[in-house]
Amino acid sequence: SRGLGDVYKRQDFIMFCFQCQETAGNKGCTKVGVCGKNENTANSQDLLIYVTKGLSEVVNKIGEVDSKYYDLISNNMFVTITNANFDEEDILRKVEETIKAKDKLIKENKLEDLSDAAKYTSDDRNELKRKAIEVGVLNIINEDERSLVELVTYGLKGMAAYNHHANVLGYRNEEVDKFIAQTLEKTLKDDKDINDLINLTMETGKHGLMAMELLDKANTEKFGNPEITEVDFSAGDNPAILISGHDLNDMEMLLEQSKDSGVDIYTHSEMLPANYYPKFKKYDLSLIHISEPTRHWAI
């Protein structure tokens, strides 16, 4: 591993992201994301993942911690998925929150012999932005190792998103919580073995399924079993709100708050299944699905 400053300078990169299928040239976005993410946001997300790995190491060393730390880990990973949060200021606040949480645990438990990700601390924005450039994807030089680490990381991001949605509905799987933290720490190892990373990828898939099962249980027990449903794809004349994503808890709150207001609710993309849940059908305000709006908006 080495810092990315020289790599960026030599290759004329100001960022590097290749986590989605739309990435530039099917290789990676190096100046601005195809999604619209700029280099400051991309680098801040890299730093958030880095300090979250550090927090994970600390949590693992302690063994038993308050569930709020696992929630913070999952939420941080969720923040970095494509189109979830492009607010650099908000991401840097989460970096600072994570550093404070990590430092508090280290001090209270007198932890030693930690990695740089666990020890790293700063409340200076300029220093945080400098560090962000050092800890990105390309910091792993070996391409096979890098690819497997990132494959695992992206699996953890999806797992964390489903885990977060289940958590807000009051459902939790401690094995999933601990797997996310333990696996994030494993990606920090300098002496990574390719076969171990392949096995870790398979374990990530297994636990990803567990997270999906947890979210399915949460959604069906709270909103009912999905039913075959005819969905309207037309648009009306009323003011409207467009909602995407997977958070049915947000959908319920939105439907309740907009009830009898004359405001229509349009689902988009991943939120299409909201139309199938029995509990949402009690609202007079019908859900309408928009297949391809010009932009994604998430509540």
Would you name each region that the model predicts?
Residues M202-G224, I228-D232, N238, G245-N249, ...:
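Gly/Pro-rich turn-and-neighbor structural signature
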Residues D190, L197-L214, E230-D232, D264, ...:
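Extended, well-ordered protein cores
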Residues F18, T30, G36:
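Cys/His/Pro-rich metal-binding microdomains
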Residues Q21:
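Cys/His-coordinated zinc-binding microdomains
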Residues G236-L287, S291, R295:
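Extended, regular secondary-structure scaffolds
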Residues S1-Y8, I288-I299:
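Single conserved hydrophobic/aromatic residue that forms the stacking wall/gate
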Residues F13-F16, G25, K31:
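Short metal-coordination and nucleic-acid-contact micro-motifs, chiefly zinc-binding Cys/His arrays
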Residues V7, G36-M212, D216-F223:
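Active-site loops and adjacent core secondary-structure elements that bind or stabilize anionic groups
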